[in-house]
Amino acid sequence: MSNLQAVIEEAFERRADITPKTVDAATRAAIEEVIEGLDSGKFRVAEKIDGEWVTHQWLKKAVLLSFRINENEIIDGAETKYYDKVALKFADYSEERFAQEGFRVVPSATVRKGAYISKNTVLMPSYVNIGAYVGEGTMVDTWATVGSCAQIGKNVHLSGGVGIGGVLEPLQANPTIIGDNCFIGARSEVVEGVIVEDGCVISMGVFIGQSTKIYDRETGEIHYGRVPAGSVVVSGSLPSKDGKYSLYCAVIVKKVDAKTLGKVGINELLRSIEE
């Protein structure tokens, strides 16, 4: 355990006693170092190690602690003012820094300090919360929300109105993760630490939480909390045990490999689900 992690872990145990007025200098410095590290991409709340996603709980704890040590203050916006404990990521950015970091931010997009945005990312009028990581080449479309500590892979498209759940409110054990080369259709929601593995296509209006049945129509298998790599998923329903009613589920209608995903358009994949 690093010294930084040790300070965070110890502070979290006494978090109820920490306020902006009582926090000691060493604890404040450690928390701010973590937030800066998350902001720059040095730290990630979750990362893939030996093929498995690992959550660094101490980083999440630092994010939670950051709310304990800061007072609300005025935040200036172009059209209004805000009043919050967390600064905005781009408050001090110059044109040169935007150009250097290599992403686009459309007016009304909001990113909190402590979120990392990779090169070649486009942020339409959307919201990215503290602790989140957005991978290279990703499009966060209009009114999409990337929740606190959520992990978004490379070359992902989060369509209009998509919601990717956070870990802070309500408190979740693990962040929601969207793998590389995924497409999440408009108004879909992926929450509660669900993992969408690489190369998945999620149709419009699909809602997936930890208790959602994810039914593979080819195998009959039911998954919880994980969408297998290469899945094409639509909303559906499954009959109850007594056959009297149906309950919502997500349905894996087919699997595609990276080569097929690269060659075939998203609309074609979704329109051919009856094949």
Swiss-Prot record:
<keyword id="KW-0808">Transferase</keyword>
<dbReference type="Pfam" id="PF14805">
    <property type="entry name" value="THDPS_N_2"/>
</dbReference>
<dbReference type="InterPro" id="IPR037133">
    <property type="entry name" value="THP_succinylTrfase_N_sf"/>
</dbReference>
<keyword id="KW-0963">Cytoplasm</keyword>
<comment type="pathway">
    <text>Amino-acid biosynthesis; L-lysine biosynthesis via DAP pathway; LL-2,6-diaminopimelate from (S)-tetrahydrodipicolinate (succinylase route): step 1/3.</text>
</comment>
<keyword id="KW-0457">Lysine biosynthesis</keyword>
<dbReference type="GO" id="GO:0009089">
    <property type="term" value="P:lysine biosynthetic process via diaminopimelate"/>
</dbReference>
<dbReference type="InterPro" id="IPR023180">
    <property type="entry name" value="THP_succinylTrfase_dom1"/>
</dbReference>
<comment type="similarity">
    <text>Belongs to the transferase hexapeptide repeat family.</text>
</comment>
<keyword id="KW-0677">Repeat</keyword>
<feature type="binding site">
    <location>
        <position position="141"/>
    </location>
    <ligand>
        <name>substrate</name>
    </ligand>
</feature>
<dbReference type="Pfam" id="PF14602">
    <property type="entry name" value="Hexapep_2"/>
</dbReference>
<dbReference type="InterPro" id="IPR001451">
    <property type="entry name" value="Hexapep"/>
</dbReference>
<dbReference type="InterPro" id="IPR011004">
    <property type="entry name" value="Trimer_LpxA-like_sf"/>
</dbReference>
<dbReference type="GO" id="GO:0016779">
    <property type="term" value="F:nucleotidyltransferase activity"/>
</dbReference>
<dbReference type="GO" id="GO:0019877">
    <property type="term" value="P:diaminopimelate biosynthetic process"/>
</dbReference>
<keyword id="KW-0012">Acyltransferase</keyword>
<keyword id="KW-0028">Amino-acid biosynthesis</keyword>
<dbReference type="GO" id="GO:0008666">
    <property type="term" value="F:2,3,4,5-tetrahydropyridine-2,6-dicarboxylate N-succinyltransferase activity"/>
</dbReference>
<dbReference type="InterPro" id="IPR018357">
    <property type="entry name" value="Hexapep_transf_CS"/>
</dbReference>
<dbReference type="InterPro" id="IPR005664">
    <property type="entry name" value="DapD_Trfase_Hexpep_rpt_fam"/>
</dbReference>
<comment type="subunit">
    <text>Homotrimer.</text>
</comment>
<protein>
    <recommendedName>
        <fullName>2,3,4,5-tetrahydropyridine-2,6-dicarboxylate N-succinyltransferase</fullName>
        <ecNumber>2.3.1.117</ecNumber>
    </recommendedName>
</protein>
<keyword id="KW-0220">Diaminopimelate biosynthesis</keyword>
<feature type="binding site">
    <location>
        <position position="104"/>
    </location>
    <ligand>
        <name>substrate</name>
    </ligand>
</feature>
<dbReference type="GO" id="GO:0005737">
    <property type="term" value="C:cytoplasm"/>
</dbReference>
